[in-house]
Amino acid sequence: MRKLIICIFMVLGGCLLSFAQHPSLLFTQEEVNEMREGKGTVPAFDKTLSEVLSAADAALNSPISVPIPADGGGGVVHEQHKSNYYAMFHCGVAYQLTGDKKYARYVADMLEAYARLYPTLGFHPVSLSPVPGRLFWQTLNESVWLVHTAVAYDCIYHTLSAKQRTTIEKNLFAPMADFIMDGMGDNHANNKTFNKMHNHATWATAAVGMIGFAMNREDYVNKALYGSDETGKRGGFIRQMDYLFSPDGYFTEGAYYQRYAIWPFVIFAQCIENKLPELEIFSYRDSILSKALSTLIQLSYEGEFFHINDALLKGLSAQELVYAADILYNVHPSDKSLLSVANEYQHTYLPTIGGFRVARDIARGEAAPIVYRSSVFRDGRKGDEGGIAVIRSTDPK
C-alpha cells in the first residue's frame, strides 16, 4: 500500500510539475535556449526573429488602447483588439528570446487593462451572430484572441506577481474561458458550438485548453480535450480529431476550411505535446494531423488550393500552413518535402524550435522535392461519405 501511495504521488507530482512549467505552450525553456544559441547561424531564421522584435518594438512605441467594443469585422475597434493580441503575442515571444522585461511589462499592462474592461462587458453591440462574443461580434474571434494571448501569458508568467496573476485570471481569462464554453445570461449557444464537430469548435477548444495550461487549470484542459461533460462522447478536441478528418486526412468542410482549421489543431497539439506528452497527440489516429497537412499539400496546384466549394484565394503560403509545416516538420523531421513547402511558398518561419529547424535544414540543403500524385481522398470519419479524386499528368508538358 505504501509503495502504491508513493507511486500515485509521483505520477500526480509529475503532472502538476508539467502544468507549472513556463514557458511550455509553443516552446519550452530548453527550446528557447537552443534558439538563442543558434542566433547568427541561420540567416533566414535570424530574419524571422528580427521581424518579431520589430513588431514587438512597434507595439511598445504605441499607446495601449483597449476600447469598448463597437463594430463588426473590419471596423476600427474590432481591428484594434485584433492588433492587440498580435502585439501581446509578439512581445511575449520577444521577452523569451531576449530576456528584456520591457516586453513582459507591455503584455502585463495590456492584460491588466483587459482585466478592467472585460467584467463590464455584456454581449457585443453588433448582434449579427447567433453566437455573439463580448470583445468581438462573434465568439470565434474571442477564441482566436485567447489562443494568441495564452501564448503571451505563458511567456511572461514568471514575471508577474501573484496578485497580478490572480487579477488577470479572475477578471479576464477565467470569465472568457467560461463564456467560450457556456455563453452567459439566457444565451448558451456557445455550449453547443464548443461541443460541435466544426472548425469554430476547434478554435474554442484550443483557446480554453491553452489558457487552461497557462493558468494551470486542469479542469479547463479536460473540458477542452473531452468536451463540456469531460466524457469525450459529446465534444472536445480528441473527438474532433476522430470525426472531422477522414482516414486519409481529408477535412469534412473541404480544403479551404481545412487550411483554417489546421491552425488551431496544430498549435493546440503542440501545447498538448509539451504539457501532456503521454497522450502522444501527434501519433493519434495514425498521425492524422500529419496526414491532414499532406492532404492539403496534395489538394493544391502551383501553391494554390483547388477552387472548389466556396474557397477563396488561399494556398501553401498562408500563415496557417506556416504553423502546420514548421510544427509538423519538428515532429517528423524525416519528411524533407516539408522543407520545400517552406522554401518555395512560405519564406517565413515560426519563432519556435520547429521554425528554427526548418530554416536550418533548408540552409543545409536537406529539402526534398514535393511529390504530387494522383490520389483519391475519402471523405467522412470512416472514409465512406464520398471523396475527391485528383488526377495528375506525369507529362511535364
Where are these regions (language model features)?
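Positively charged n-region of N-terminal signal peptides that target proteins for export
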Residues: 1-4
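Short, charged, low-hydrophobicity "junction" segments
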Residues: 15, 28, 369-373
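Bacterial N-terminal signal peptides
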Residues: 6-15
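Boundary at the C-terminal end of the N-terminal hydrophobic targeting segment
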Residues: 18-20
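Aromatic- and acidic-residue-enriched carbohydrate-binding clefts of CAZyme catalytic domains
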Residues: 68-75
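Carbohydrate-active enzyme catalytic cores, enriched for enzymes
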Residues: 215, 260-397
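Hydrophobic alpha-helical membrane context
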Residues: 14-15, 40, 314
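Aromatic-lined, polymer-binding surfaces characteristic
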Residues: 24-26, 30-61, 75-293
